Amino acid sequence: MAEILVVDDDALIRNTLSELLSLQHKCQTAETAEIALAKLEADSFDVVLTDISMPGLSGLELLGHVLQKYPHTPVIIISGISDQDHAQGLIKLGAFDYLLKPFRLEVVEKSVMRAVEHRRRLQEGTTLDGDEAEAAAADDPTDWKIV
């Protein structure tokens, strides 16, 4: 069972994601990036799911900390910013995925499952086979057409 950390200052979104992900994973929540960093120090997480715009440290700053200290931990960004350049920029910085608010729960679940598998493969030192790489590329936000 994967350990997921959900970070969002909006209690409704945070609790909705936690309830959804708790069906298949162990889930903890944090309402700020600062609380998330403390939880990351105390526990090991397989995936971090974070909002980008929060009071205090932003999700972008959290992404930087996670990439630096926990490079095998995928970070999924959830944001209301529908700018394709913004999404591509965060992916280039190292975010595993970029999901738009409002989001569909099945899309979040699929992204988390891919991130868990990605982390497992990184830890094992394996890579995606051809079919899996093609499927992952099909989900790449750089292919999105945001309107």
Describe the function of each predicted region.
Residues 11-28:
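Two-component/phosphorelay signaling modules centered on CheY-like receiver
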Residues 32-35, 58-61:
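Acidic catalytic/metal-coordinating carboxylates
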Residues 54:
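Receiver (REC) domain active-site loop signature in two-component systems and cognate sites
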Residues 85, 103-112:
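C-terminal output helix
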